[in-house]
Swiss-Prot record:
The gene is Ctnna2. Residues 928-938 have a biased composition (Basic residues). Its main location: membrane. The modification Phosphothreonine is found at T632. This is Catenin alpha-2. It comes from the Eukaryota. Expressed almost exclusively in the nervous system. Interacts with CDH1 and CDH2. Interacts with ZNF639; recruits CTNNA2 to the nucleus. Interacts with F-actin. May function as a linker between cadherin adhesion receptors and the cytoskeleton to regulate cell-cell adhesion and differentiation in the nervous system. Required for proper regulation of cortical neuronal migration and neurite growth. It acts as a negative regulator of Arp2/3 complex activity and Arp2/3-mediated actin polymerization. It thereby suppresses excessive actin branching which would impair neurite growth and stability. Regulates morphological plasticity of synapses and cerebellar and hippocampal lamination during development. Functions in the control of startle modulation. Keywords: Cell adhesion, Cell junction, Cell membrane, Cell projection, Cytoplasm, Cytoskeleton, Developmental protein, Differentiation, Membrane, Nucleus, Phosphoprotein. InterPro entries: Alpha-catenin/vinculin-like_sf (IPR036723), Alpha_catenin (IPR001033), Vinculin/catenin (IPR006077), Vinculin_CS (IPR000633).
Length: 953
């Protein structure tokens, strides 16, 4: 315990003339101005006018004398009131009086003879001495203020120690009441000191320390009370000791900030922009070199080392558990692209060595290098946003589960959930640090790191509070202690969330949120179809959480813009999502869960749920479109989710060559791209025929609104997958390996099976036997061509690349034919298998397997794949038409009320909306939409003082 008589140690050199507060600066400024003006009188040398006394100089000298007298009076008053610095203040006052008298004499003599350089020099020396003396007096007065603050701190420390030593709850209440009174006084004095501090860092430290003191004082009472009530529970002591330590650190922080001796941000590790962002920035600067001074031996190792360091950081992010597979592949691909761009750039520098100016190829290489690093940044930002979107979703759930377990008194369960809560907290901190690593916002990064540090230290104490409650579930004191720590945790998580949101891009957030909601919508639909209630409930909750985050963040973002057309459009979109779309979605989720959870599953309208889910996705997409309305083309390009396919995604251990050799480890897509030109031409002919069939399907499905019509939805899905498969035969598209082609064929088969089920239901309701037979015949074609597509894709899978040469294994076709009916019996039943097998295409069987030309085998395999896709496309077109015709026959017999049967709903698609008036040019519109300045809260006292200051001029 600190003794009441122990001296207060001031960490401040009294001899220092460093000005640390705005008050000292403000008081000193008029005197400096007056002295400077006096010194500069007749500065330009002797005047041509009649010599005589300068009235202006005498007036200035008098004003300096009066100002000095004012300082003396104030200094004497402060010296009388001060206890700790009385001697120093008295000595400083006497020094000011002495220097003031010297200045009075020197200025008077100079005013009488302003042209005398000797008298002017004497006055300049006297002025300097006077300013030094006055500055020292003001600094000592400032020190006296700090000493008063330190005295308050000492009293608070003693009151804190008294609270810690309380022996019972009544004693604790009395001592805490005294502690609260002293806290109020300290806060007032510290707030005044904070306003006066000149250094922004010290002001921030003072504000942070005051905030920490206020925050922890709330927990101090409940933690101490819990310890006194349940001293046998070890967790209560841990809680109390933690809070006391936090309060002591806050008091020390106020002391350090008041004396401007706070540890720097560098010492705390909170300073600077993100490490990866800084490395990328530095790399972008280093690649701009002078060809005249370029030396490969000097610059190549340096640039390559810097790039590999960046790629190592990117690889860590790519390998993180929350990074999605497609994002991981894109990051790896961008890293390879950046590597290649650097080699190309260095080659161009070597070609331009010794030249005064950079040639066009070199400038192009520099631009390409910059673009590739920008693309890598974008993928890293999106990867981080993936993490943020997943980790900062429903952040209170682990805490609530932990508290519920604690209330039940199940200590074993509490320990299990405590581990989950700890992992959740660690994940928040990890993701926050990831967000910092790629951010250029220095102040924002500092806030995130500070908030993450608080989360890290608070997590164990929340668990201790839960353990206390679990040990004494009936104790109101334990419950109150838990509530206080719960509130503190939730506040700190909100602070961290807002800080992370501030250093991340709204555009990236919307792009990733849109993708994640689409993923979750698909999961919901699958869970609904499979009757998985738990997955449906959990995923629907995630959708609601993501949508709520979108609404909150966008509404907050719009507060930074001046009200206008732009903000109105964005806010309309958020309002529609929050007030119309989400309530409908929640209602449909509730209906679906009730129906699936019943003892006997109840029928419900599945299409209604799918429509409600789709509207959520559409709502988020509309918000994103509205937000991007004022973006520049460059910003839109940087935000684009479109991934260039000008590189091949390889594993990090694969061999890479400068030319287009066929090498082990290449993807099958790359192999297809390297076929001879004549083979490519033949494939192109087949693709052209396929596109003709595709255009027919596009024209057919474009007529219909796909909401409530799963036949149209499935037709679109099958068309998209078939396009990807035909792109694969040309060495393009998202399918990279033969396994991807097989999976795509399986997806088509699954979609075909679902379409078969729907269309058969339509056929069953059709009263016209001719229409019914036509529809069933087309469905047989779909089953047949799905079967063909599966076979062709699997025969294609047997094409291998060995030793740099393409060969086709001899057992591929036979094994595919013999196993197909066992693997894909869901496509066509065994009874129709023998009937359909006679119509199967010759999938590469025209060429002798293993003995003919490998290119010919590849060509046959590719053309068979395209032919099967074309046939399937045609069958889908005919099925869509026949399904509609069958529905119209049903309508004619049973009436118009039954046209939208329970199977599918046939509604004409509404035409696209067109503007009634000509749109303004984007550049003209953009000039009127500008970001508003941040709202500043000005206190009435400050406003009044500024008004008085203006009135005084």
């Amino acid at each position: 315990m600190t003794s009441a008589t122990s001296p207060i140690i001031l960490k401040w050199d009294p001899k220092s003339l460093e000005i640390r507060t705005l008050t000292v600066e403000r008081l000193l400024e008029p005197l400096v101005t007056q002295v400077t003006t006096l010194v500069n009188t007749s500065n330009k040398g002797p005047s041509g006018k009649k010599k005589g006394r300068s009235k202006k100089a005498h007036v200035l000298a008098a004003s300096v004398e009066q100002a000095t007298q004012n300082f003396l009076e104030k200094g004497e008053q402060i010296a009388k009131e001060s206890q700790d610095l009385k001697e120093e203040l008295v000595a400083a006052v006497e020094d000011v009086r002495k220097q003031g008298e010297t200045m009075r004499i020197a200025s008077s003599e100079f005013a009488d003879d302003p042209c005398s350089s000797v008298k002017r020099g004497t006055m300049v020396r006297a002025a300097r001495a006077l300013l030094s003396a006055v500055t020292r007096l003001l600094i000592l007065a400032d020190m006296a203020d700090v000493m008063r603050l330190l005295s308050h701190l000492k009293i608070v420390e003693e009151a804190l120690e008294a609270v810690k030593n309380a022996t019972n709850e009544q004693d604790l209440a009395n001592r805490f009441k005294e502690f609260g009174k002293e806290m109020v006084k300290l806060n007032y004095v510290a707030a005044r000191r904070q306003q006066e501090l000149k250094d922004p860092h010290c002001r921030d430290e003072m504000a942070a320390a005051r905030g920490a003191l206020k925050k922890n004082a709330t927990m101090l009472y409940t933690a101490s009370q819990a310890f006194l009530r349940h001293p046998d529970v070890a967790a209560t002591r841990a809680n109390r000791d933690y809070v006391f330590k936090q309060v002591q650190e806050a008091i020390a922080g106020i002391s350090s900030a008041a004396q401007a001796t706070s540890p720097t941000d560098e010492a705390k590790g909170h300073t600077g922009i993100g490490e990866l962002a800084a490395a990328l920035n530095e790399f972008d600067n280093k690649i701009i070199l002078d060809p005249m001074t370029f030396s490969e031996a000097r610059f190549r190792p340096s640039l390559e080392e810097r790039l590999e360091s960046i790629i190592s950081g990117a690889a860590l992010m790519a390998d993180s558990s929350c990074t999605r597979d497609d994002r991981r592949e894109r990051i790896v691909a961008e890293c390879n692209a950046v590597r290649q761009a650097l080699q190309d750039l260095l080659s161009e520098y070597m070609n331009n060595t010794g030249r005064k100016e950079k040639g066009d190829p070199l400038n192009i290489a520099i631009d390409k290098m910059t673009k590739k690093t920008r693309d890598l940044r974008r993928q890293l930002r999106k990867a981080v946003m993936d993490h943020i979107s997943d980790s900062f979703l429903e952040t209170n759930v682990p805490l609530l589960v932990l508290i519920e377990a604690a209330k039940s008194g199940n200590e074993k369960e509490v320990k299990e959930y405590a581990q989950v809560f700890r992992e959740h907290a660690n994940k928040l901190v990890e993701v926050a640090n990831l967000a910092c690593s790629i951010s250029n916002n220095e102040e924002g990064v500092k806030l995130v790191r500070m908030a993450a540090t608080q989360i890290d230290s608070l997590c164990p104490q929340v668990i201790n509070a839960a353990l206390t409650l679990a040990a004494r579930p009936q104790s109101k004191v334990a419950q109150d202690n838990m509530d206080v720590f719960k509130d503190q945790w939730e506040k700190q998580v909100r602070v961290l969330t807002e800080a992370v949101d501030d250093i991340t891009s709204v555009d990236d957030f919307l792009s990733v949120s849109e993708n994640h909601i689409l993923e979750d919508v698909n999961k919901c639909v699958i869970a609904l179809q499979e009757g998985d209630v738990d997955t449906l409930d959990r995923t629907a909750g995630a959708i609601r959480g993501r949508a709520a985050r979108v609404i909150h963040i966008i509404n907050a973002e719009m507060e930074n813009y001046e009200a206008g057309v732009y903000t109105e459009k964005v806010l309309e979109a958020t309002k529609l999502l929050s007030e119309t779309v989400m309530p409908r979605f929640a209602e449909q989720v509730e209906v679906a869960i009730e129906a699936l959870s019943a003892n006997v599953p109840q029928p419900f309208e599945e299409n209604e749920f799918i429509d409600a889910s789709r509207l959520v996705y559409d709502g988020v997409r509309d918000i994103r479109k509205a937000v991007l309305m004022i973006r520049t083309p460059e910003e839109l390009e940087d935000d684009s989710d479109f991934e260039q396919e000008d590189y091949d995604v390889r594993s990090r251990t694969s061999v890479q060559t400068e030319d287009d050799q066929l090498i082990a480890g290449q993807s099958a897509r790359a192999i297809m791209a390297q076929l001879p030109q004549e083979e490519k031409a033949k494939i192109a002919e087949q693709v052209e025929i396929f596109h003709q069939e595709k255009s027919k399907l596009d024209a057919e499905v474009a007529k219909w609104d796909d909401s409530g019509n799963d036949i149209i939805v499935l037709a679109k899905q099958m068309c998209m997958i078939m396009m990807e498969m035909t792109d694969f035969t040309r060495g393009k598209g998202p399918l990279k390996n033969t396994s991807d082609v097989i999976n795509a064929a399986k997806k088509i088969a699954e979609a075909g099976s679902r379409m078969d089920k729907l269309a058969r239901a339509v056929a069953d309701q059709c009263p016209d036997s001719a229409c019914k037979q036509d529809l069933l015949a087309y469905l047989q074609r779909i089953a047949l061509y799905c079967h063909q597509l599966n076979i062709c894709s699997k025969v294609k899978a047997e094409v291998q690349n060995l030793g740099g040469e393409l060969i086709v294994s001899g057992t591929g076709v036979q094994s595919t034919f013999t196993t197909f009916y066992e693997v894909d019996c869901d496509v066509i039943d065994g009874g129709r298998a023998s009937q359909l097998s006679t119509h199967l295409p010759t999938c590469a069987e025209g060429a002798p397997i293993g003995s003919g030309s490998s290119d010919s085998s590849m060509l046959d395999s590719a053309t068979s794949l395209i032919q099967a896709a074309k046939n399937l496309m045609n069958a889908v077109v005919l099925t869509v038409k026949a399904s509609y015709v069958a529905s119209t026959k049903y309508q004619k017999v049973y009436g118009t009320a039954a046209v939208n049967s329970p199977v599918v709903s046939w509604k004409m698609k509404a035409p696209e909306k067109k503007p009634l008036v000509k749109r303004e040019k984007p550049e003209e519109f953009q000039t009127r939409v500008r970001r508003g300045s941040q709202k500043k809260h000005i206190s009435p006292v400050q406003a009044l003082s500024e008004f008085k200051a203006m009135d005084s001029f």
